[in-house]
Structure formats: C-alpha cells, structure tokens
Amino acid sequence: MELEKVKINSLHCNDAVLSSLQASPSATHPQSVPSKANAVTEASIIEKTNLQHNVQEDNSYNRDCDSPVSSSSEPEKELDDLRYLHSSSLTNSVVVGKSTGSLNGAYSITSVTSKTKTLEPNSASGSACLTIAPTADHIKKRIPSSRTPTRKALRIKFYRNGDRFYPGITIPVSNERYRSFERLFEDLTRLLEENVKIPGAVRTIYNMCGKKITSLDELEDGQSYVCSCNNENFKKVEYNTGSQPLSNLTLTSSRSNSHRLDKCRPSSPLKNGLLAGSSPLPTCGGGTGNGSPHIASRSSDRVTVVHPRIVTLIRSGTKPRRIMRLLLNKRNSPSFDHVLTAITQVVRLDTGYVRKVFTLSGVSVVRLSDFFGSDDVFFAYGTERINTAEDFKLEAEEHRAINVIRKTMRTTGTTCKGPKPKMPIKSKKVYPPVVDSEAFKAATTPEDDSHAALLTSTGMEINELPSNIRNTYTLGRIIGDGNFAIVFKIKHRQTGHSYALKIIDKNKCKGKEHYIDAEVRVMKKLNHPHIISLILSVDQNTNMYLVLEYVSGGDLFDAITQVTRFSESQSRIMIRHLGAAMTYLHSMGIVHRDIKPENLLVKLDEHGHVLELKLADFGLACEVNDLLYAVCGTPTYVAPEILLEVGYGLKIDVWAAGIILYILLCGFPPFVAPDNQQEPLFDAIISGIYEFPDPYWSDIGDGVRDLIANMLQADPDVRFTSEDILDHPWTIGNQNECTTYKR
C-alpha cells in the first residue's frame, strides 16, 4: 500500500491530533504502541472531559432540549474516537520516535491517496517513524449519520396570561417541530389544558414586556413568554418565575400528566364532543394518572369543591365601606392563593395585596372550601390591624347594599299576583304548507311546475335558483320566514336526505349587507354537533342561497307553545346542549347576539321528548375583538348592557340563555310588561330584579334557581360564563350538591 510521509520538527502534538492517531494496516510496521504516551494522552482527555462535565452540570437546564450532538462536549468526542482506535484490529499501530527538534511542532500534510500516513522525524537521530490514522475529516465520516449535527431547538418557557401562580411549561421549539405558528398554538393549547383551566384556544403569544409575537423567528432561546387565549389583552403581573426548576418543566413531564382537570365536564365543547342527554355522565377521578401528587391533589380539590359562584366582598376601610361582587369559578379559583389574587384585583386595597379574609361572622377563611360553603359575604383585609369589636359590624347603609345584592340573587318563591304572564309573540312567521302534503305527493303536474308554484307564492321564479341547487335538490314546503329571508325544506335527489334552503333577499337588507357576509363567514368556521351546519352557499346579485342542516322537530318556540313548560330533566338536556354550543362559539371569539327559542331547533322522539338541541340563525353573529355597541337582538332576551349602551361582549348570550331556561321551566319570561310595551320591559331588564312566583315555581328545585340567578346578573362582570353553565352542579346533574345552596 502506498504511504505518504510527512516530516515533523517536534513530537509536540495537541490532543486533537493525538485523538486521530491510528496505526497503519501495513504489515511492514511494528505493532507496538508506547503505553506511556497513550496513558498521558487519555488521562489528559479524561481530565478535560471531567472539567467540561462540571461546567455543564451548573448549566444543565440549558441542555435539556439540545440534540444528541449539540449536548456532547468536544473532549467526549475526542475520547470516544481515541477509544475507538484502540479497539481496532491488530493491524492498527502507532510508532512514536524520539526527536530533538524544536517545540514548534510544524508539519505539512499532503493529499491522502491511502487511508494512512507516515510521519518521519526531521531529526537525524530519530530512527523511528510515526504512522498517523486518518484525519479528523475521515473520522467524522465514520460517525453514524444519527449523530450528524441538527439545528438546535430553542428552549422556551410559556406562562398562562394573568396567572401569577402557574409555574409555566417549558418546551423545545424549532422550525422542524413546528412548521407554522398555528401548530405551536395548538400544542400550547393542549399542554395548558392538562395543567390549568383556560377559556379557549391559545391565540396570541406575548413577550414578558407585552409585545405581541407574530412568528417563530421572534422567539429567543431561554426566554419566557405569555400565552393568551381568545382575545385577552396582555396582563402584566409578577409571573411565577421561581416556583420550580426550569429543568423539571419539560414537555415530557407535562405530557405525563394525564389527569385532566376537566374530566367532570359533561362534554368538551372545544373539541366538538357530543353530549347526549340520555347518556350517563362521566365519573370524576377514575384512576391515579401519571401526574405529580401536587397536581392530582389540586385537581381532586377543584373537582370536589370549586363550582361557579358569586360572592360579596366588603373592602376594609372607613365606614360605610365599599361593597362589590366577584364571580368565582374553576378558571380563577384553582387554589386558595388564586382566590386571594382575584379578590385583590377587585377590591384594590390601599395596602396592596389581600392577606386576610373573614366571613360575616368574623371567622377567618383559611381554606379554598371556605369560599364555597354556606357563607357568601366576606371581609377583605391587607396588612392593616383588625378591630374585631367594630370591623365585623355592618352599618345600616352597608346592610341595605348587601340586601339589594341578595335581592338579585333571591331564589325563594313569591306569590304571583294577577294573571299568569304570557310568552311574547313569535318574532317570525312560520307558514303552513302552501301545497297539501298528500296532494303534493299525488300531484300529476311536472316537478318543475310544483317548484314554480312554490316560488311564485314568494315572488320568486324557478329560474332564479342556482343550477347546482336546482339540479341537486327537490324543493319542498316553506318552513320559515324572517325579515330578510325565507326558508324551504329541500330533499337531495340521490340520497333522499332533507336539508333547509335559506334564501336571503339582498334588496330587503340594503345597507346591512355586512350582516349577510358575517353570517356566511362565521358559519363556514363552525363545526359543532349542537350548531346547525352550513352545507353550501351560493352568492348571486339579488339573493344569497344557503343550504343548511335540517332538524325535523322545528324550533323551540313551537315546542314551548305545545307543552307550556318542560321538566327539569328535559330542561337540563337543552341547557347542556345550548351551553356547549355557546362555549364553542365563545372560545372562537364569536358572539351570537340573537339567542332565542325561535333560533333553537330541537329533535324530538315519538313521545315528544327533546333529544337534541341545535343553535341556528347566525345573521347577527360577529367576531368580538373589542366591546360592541350596536343595539340589536330581540327585546325579551336583550341584556342590560345592550340597553345601557355601555359596551358588551360574549356574556350577552349567557343572559339570553338564562331567560330561555327560565321560560322552559315555567312557560313565561322573567321580565314582562303589560301589552308588550318596550319601555317598561327595558326598565325591568335594566333593574335586574325578577321573581320566582308560586305556584309556577313551587315544584322546581333550588339548584336550577341558583343557576338562573347567576346567569341573569345585570352586572356582566359577575355573570356566569358559558363554561360556568356547564360546570354548575345542576347542569352536571349532582342534585345533592345543588340542595346545599344558601342565599
């Protein structure tokens, strides 16, 4: 084999060169390796490796997410290469000769034509030769491809917006792992749901200064960021940066936490889960899971203790003291400290944080469960001294303020004076079949003539229908009519499935075309079992055509008219389905703005019992990016903040749902006015005061009354959210817990 000889002036070689030494496979060279030289070399490399390990242990949290190559030190690789050479075949050898040359160690290496090199000392006295293994480049080529360096992932910590107690979650982020910013949002949503309650999907990421992050390239390694759900603004709080070592908050540990905090929910509306009214509810707990004991304990505590509730707070200070209210739920009350933080943000003490809380009788509140017991009025104190003899006594003005609040929360029945209130007039007409069904089946006229007759009755022509609708569906009877639209029942020619065709007349909504565009845009985004699906949309100059899912039972208004009132079990099914639909909408930042019985379609069994409810008619729906001020909706179901024109958001849908639940149980709305006059009706709505009059409510439990009272809060800040409806014990079906409410 051809060998190249390289002359050197010195035997001084650094560790990098010695690590690449290998004997020539040629049989002409003696197979001897000076043990002393090898021992010194290996000892030097081991010492260097140990030193590197000590440094890396101090900074271990920066190495958790590195690739296998990036986390290995150079001395380790040198040592591995040297040991690899030592374990080679017997033909591999290194011969080191003596030299009297200088310490410059200068040498030259020419191109390699063979796999080995021979180095001959410059000094004449050196008779031995030095055979060198392949260069470092050739050694790297022998390293398996799995050790090829990859792009280092960024190790980033994410907090929940506004939650100063949540320790955060740390995950590796790279362009290879997340091809888009939306993919990162999806992963963060999943990870946060495993540890805390969040109101919806992660939509925005901020840095710790509140700057919005718009791409993966803006993320920096080792930095912390804040995840915001829906349209939340950045909340500048002191995030819990020192609660847990960074190395412990890894993606692996978060994924092992299989004890989901929302397992007791009837369904997960964010994941389009079906919520059948007849199916048994899932049980809480169900296994230990792989999460930490702390998380499991916190989850168990929340499941057994925390439920949506409004409490009254008395702020410490000069009498008469300020009195305010706070909505507690699973999102702001996962722990005792979280509740104190929520109280602090509401009462705004001059001394800073709330440190001590007492009941109205002066008992100190020390556990999370104390906030969800029989007491609903609490004193909030900071670091100031407490005068137990005077501070826990209420003045007359304070008594009156608390009684006014309790009046809005009253669930006891009162005797109804006068005749029974009536349901309002239906806000849209429902036509009877234009053609008798039996006569229609037996008609001998051509199909197109029947269609033409139906359309002519509405002022339309058969040729106006889009060809893809006319050729795919057969036209049936008119099933509904609104201010701007008419609805037909249609049937697919091939499958025989029934659908609804909504024809919107653009001439009737001049200047309001944006409502049509918003309806179509919103419905294209939606996919939920309790929301009517959009099958097809066709836009023409004069009309907009929407092919929609058809529900056989008609709307809820007609069902109420037929049965007058529903049982609690039937009402529970409907409010679950409506609550799930609203939660799904609100998680996407969409408000319906026109929830009423006419826009709720029901599916009935052969006995007339409600099996399923679906939300329809998104003509007024819109995306909420800020407070809305447009006055719209139906008078009976409109929320106080709409009438006051102070700005409103998602919770107006909860108010409307509360009105509907009230109607389902007794057959009439809580706010009525003589002869349907709007001014007295609006005054009653703004006051927020209503009754549960006997005998219509005498057989209805306190649990559902409590739910209605929380949904019909005039102050939107303390009104239930759509998720709170689903979390309420009555909705879940825990009757025992419902009976413990005290107002």
From Swiss-Prot:
The active site is at residue 594. SUPFAM superfamilies: Doublecortin (DC), Protein kinase-like (PK-like). Its EC number is 2.7.11.1. Residues 473-731 form the Protein kinase domain. ATP binds at residues 479-487, 502. The keyword Phosphoprotein applies. Residues 154-240, 309-392 form the Doublecortin domain. Gene3D superfamilies: Doublecortin domain, Transferase(Phosphotransferase) domain 1. InterPro entries: Doublecortin_dom, Doublecortin_dom_sf, Kinase-like_dom_sf, Prot_kinase_dom, Protein_kinase_ATP_BS, Ser/Thr_kinase_AS. GO terms for molecular function: ATP binding; protein serine kinase activity; protein serine/threonine kinase activity. Keywords: ATP-binding, Kinase, Nucleotide-binding, Phosphoprotein, Repeat, Serine/threonine-protein kinase, Transferase. GO terms for biological process: intracellular signal transduction. The keyword Hydrolase does not apply. It holds the Pfam family Pkinase. CDD domains: DCX1 (cd16109). Coiled coil: none annotated. It catalyses: L-seryl-[protein] + ATP = O-phospho-L-seryl-[protein] + ADP + H(+); L-threonyl-[protein] + ATP = O-phospho-L-threonyl-[protein] + ADP + H(+). It is an enzyme of class 2 (transferase). Residues 54-78 are annotated as: Disordered. Belongs to the protein kinase superfamily. CAMK Ser/Thr protein kinase family. CaMK subfamily. This is Serine/threonine-protein kinase GD17699. It comes from Drosophila simulans.
